Design a protein with these regions (language model features):
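Glycine/proline-rich active-site loop of Rossmann-fold NAD(P)-dependent oxidoreductases
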Residues: 140, 152-154, 165-174, 208-218
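Mid/C-terminal beta-alpha module of Rossmann-like enzyme folds, strongest
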Residues: 2, 211-258, 291, 297
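N-terminal Rossmann NAD(P)H-binding glycine-rich loop of SDR-like oxidoreductase domains
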Residues: 3-23
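NAD(P)H-binding glycine-rich loop region in Rossmannoid oxidoreductase-like domains
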Residues: 36, 41-92
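Conserved beta-loop-beta element that borders a ligand/cofactor-binding pocket
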Residues: 111, 144-167
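Alpha-helical substrate-binding/gating segment
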Residues: 175-183, 191-225
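Conserved Rossmann-fold NAD(P)-dependent oxidoreductase catalytic core, especially the SDR/UDP-sugar
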Residues: 91-133
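C-terminal amphipathic/interface module of NAD(P)-dependent oxidoreductases
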Residues: 261-297
Length: 297
């Protein structure tokens, strides 16, 4: 297949592109700085800054574009950047798809379990209604834009992704804290943490590219979510480091502001559709996932 990945220079995009390249697919990666990314990346692919630079028909599109939610405070200006980098960019992508003589067969669009907001103890399958906080509203608007691809006759899947454990994202800074003897939970760590190993995220996306019966939202989270304190205690055990710092949640608010919601929202997601599909999990539990990732590094 000829597969277009937008946001192809990020942690997830690069991991997916590497796997798809090894499987023999033809790749086009969209980035704001294609020349720089082409020099950095070892993946054989065409890099483009403009969608109109793509000259060959595309069979599948994986949309992973979007500014980082955590790096900067959520000022009104930053919220606009976060919104536009997802909704407006996805709208432009759909406009490009609509103008193709041969539209893609499948469209996988980024999303997040933040769709559900803070669900407490409730199990969130793909049928669960969306939350009301700002991150949830952002994800819901992103999905609402993406599903319009169905009007083009394109099978559309929404990748409701949990925190991905791998060489990027949440895990590396956590490991540094633990290795420095500063590891700990957040408050009591009682909130649910719906994680996924990068290998399973890539494997699930590959399965969704070819499984023609699946459409709509799909939870990309491991089948065994844990409370956050179990995640940190397991990480400490794997790294042979103590887990003793547990700053109260109220202490995070002055530093992180609204971004605290990203860290402490309780989301107990269940990958109902992936399980029904018969997806074989490489790392279904947090102990095996962290052991693998810490051993690799």
């Amino acid at each position: 297949m000829h597969i277009l990945i937008t946001g192809g220079s990020g942690f997830l995009g690069q991991a997916l592109a590497q796997a798809l390249s090894q499987d023999g697919h033809t790749l086009t990666l969209h980035s704001r700085n294609p020349q720089r990314q082409a020099k950095r990346s070892q993946i054989p692919a065409q890099w483009v800054a403009q969608l109109n630079d793509i000259t060959e028909p595309v069979d599948a599109v994986v949309n992973l574009t979007g500014a980082n939610l955590f790096t900067l405070p959520w000022s009104a200006r930053r919220k606009s950047v976060l919104w536009n980098s997802r909704i407006d960019t996805t709208r432009a992508l759909l406009d490009w798809m609509a103008g193709q003589e041969q539209p893609p067969q499948v469209f996988l669009s980024g999303s997040a379990v933040g769709f559900y907001g803070d669900c407490g103890e409730q199990v969130c399958t793909e049928q669960q209604a969306g939350g009301n906080d700002w991150p949830a509203q952002l994800v819901q608007a992103w999905e609402a834009q993406a599903v319009l691809a169905q009007n083009l006759g394109v099978r559309t899947v929404l990748l409701r992704t949990g925190p991905v454990l791998g060489a990027g994202g949440l895990l590396p800074p956590q490991k540094l804290l633990f290795q420095a003897g500063l590891g700990g939970s957040l408050g009591r760590g009682a909130f649910w943490f719906s994680w996924i190993h990068i290998a399973d995220w890539v494997g699930a996306v590959k399965a969704l590219l070819v499984e023609e019966t699946v459409m709509g939202p799909v939870n990309l989270t491991a089948p065994q979510p844990v409370r956050y304190r179990e995640f940190t205690s397991t990480l400490g055990s794997v790294l042979h480091r103590p887990v003793w710092l547990s700053p109260p949640l109220w202490a995070l608010q002055p530093v992180l502001g609204q971004r605290t919601q990203l860290l402490t929202a309780s989301t107990r997601a269940e990958p109902e559709k992936l399980n029904a599909l018969g997806y074989t999990w490489q790392f279904p539990d947090i102990a095996s996932a962290l052991s693998d990732l810490c051993q690799r590094s």
